[in-house]
Every structure is written in structure tokens, then in C-alpha cells.
Amino acid sequence: MVLGRGLLGRWSVAELGAVCARLGLGPALLGSLHHLGLRKSLTVDQGTMKVELLPALTDNYMYLLIDEDTKEAAIVDPVQPQKVVETARKHGVKLTTVLTTHHHWDHAGGNEKLVKLEPGLKVYGGDDRIGALTHKVTHLSTLQVGSLHVKCLSTPCHTSGHICYFVTKPNSPEPPAVFTGDTLFVAGCGKFYEGTADEMYKALLEVLGRLPADTRVYCGHEYTINNLKFARHVEPDNTAVREKLAWAKEKYSIGEPTVPSTIAEEFTYNPFMRVREKTVQQHAGETEPVATMRAIRKEKDQFKMPRD
């Protein structure tokens, strides 16, 4: 689907969203809106910690993490470096740090260019395949972005070196944040390219699932609607799934992100976080959480997405 600039000049983003939703063209709309610069960014002010969501490529997110106390900033997965530099300048912050969740091109592919644009950046990641890497981290490694504390969480499965970054402001009541790359999505999880169901179970339930319930979840892609359609298939009577899906469709229709969620919310509608629930196990025909994880991931990989 191609949307001409003349069409965009006559219709608002919301009107285009409504038309494409009626025609079952949601994914095409999102890609088109992005390429014409209309997929919206969002700034989440959590207190001292500020997070700007930067749409990238077709459905990726980069995240500018800002410490308001020191005006120091980090960027998560900067696949479009020029956009990152311009956004940092807009906020008047000093970009010091790159937090790379994993080595895939749509997350790490901008690292080399960014370090040329901004010499002296510290580039963190858990995999030697990450471009421009200066600081290799492991599980529970820590670092600072200004006054913000960052803890590295190893979550191998999507890739063997995948890291999630858990960010807190010490001695502050503001909620934490976790940048989950392609491990945890809103209502979903990443494909098991280099790992197993057991590893994803540990990543979701034993690592991320044990973070504070109010932790904001900033994931790597805008996959929420399709994830919730699968969640609805798994648990058709789950009210939380249906309510979140209706909300996400509304956000999508006006070009707004569905991120962040929270850890607490994910336990109510994400089937991969709910593999200990009897309803999910019964759908999978299993009685054990890891086997359920394996079964529903295999099913989702082959799932024909409804067009509603």
C-alpha cells in the first residue's frame, strides 16, 4: 500500500487510521506512516528519569533515556543514528552511552555510524557480534547514566547474548524502567532463534517477572495488536486481553505507540507470562509451564493473524 503526500495532506493520521482499519490494512498503514515521518514519538516523564520513544524503521523503537538531574543520556538500540543525535540536541542533553539489547541489525546496525557522529560513546552489550562494542556486560553487571542506576539482565533465547536493561533512580519513589529488546514485548515475546523454551521461561518469569510490578516495560517493536490477537486466541474469555486490544487499536489508529506497559499488566494478558495459568496450559494441551511455553511459541510462529 502506498499513501501519497496529497492524500496525507487531505486526511489526518486518525482518519487514515480509521480507513485502513476498516480495510484490514493496519500493518501497511504503520509502515507507510513511518516512512512519511508521521509515526509519533512519545516522551514519558517518570520523574528524574525521562524516556523518549523514537520510532525507527517500520516497527522498531529506539529509546533516549535522560537523567534530568545531570542532563546525561543513553540511547537504547540506535538503528537510526542521525535521528538520535538530533533528538539529544533537541533535549539539550549529553549523549554518553549506548545500551544495545542484542546484535540483530535492526537494533545494533547503527552503532558504528553513531560512534563516528558522537566520538567517545560507551557502547554496552552482551555479545561480541555487536558493532562498536566497548563494554561487554554479563548478568547483573551495573553502570550509571548520570544519577540513574542501570542493571544488566541476561535473557538469552532470542539471541544467546541478549541483555535487558533495568533502570532505577536510587532513593526515589519514581517507577523503574526495563528495556527488553526482543525478549519481552507488550503481550508477547521474541522468537527462540538461539535458545529454548526453558531459557525464555527463565527470562520472562524468573528474571523480568520478578522485577517490581510497576516497572515500565519498553520493548523493541510495535507488535502489540497482533500479539493481543494471539492472546485472545489462547484465552478467549480473558477480559484483560480484550480491553487491552481495544485500547491498542485506538492508539494505533492515531499513530500513537502502545508502549510502555508494566510488568503487572503483562501478567494479566501476555500468554507467555501466563504459562503457569491453567487456562493457558489447557489451550496448549500441557500441564507444565515450560512445555506450555514451547507449545504456544510454536503455535504463534504458525498463527494466521485475523484481520479484525
Swiss-Prot record:
It is an enzyme of class 3 (hydrolase). Its EC number is 3.1.2.6. Pfam families: HAGH_C, Lactamase_B. SMART domains: Lactamase_B (SM00849). It catalyses: an S-(2-hydroxyacyl)glutathione + H2O = a 2-hydroxy carboxylate + glutathione + H(+); (R)-S-lactoylglutathione + H2O = (R)-lactate + glutathione + H(+). The modification N6-acetyllysine is found at residues 116, 229. Binds 2 Zn(2+) ions per subunit. It comes from the Eukaryota. One of its GO terms (molecular function) is metal ion binding. One of its GO terms (cellular component) is mitochondrial matrix. Zn(2+) 1 binds at residues 102, 104, 158, 182. Zn(2+) 2 binds at residues 106-107, 182, 221. Thiolesterase that catalyzes the hydrolysis of S-D-lactoyl-glutathione to form glutathione and D-lactic acid. Monomer. This is Hydroxyacylglutathione hydrolase, mitochondrial. It comes from Bos taurus.
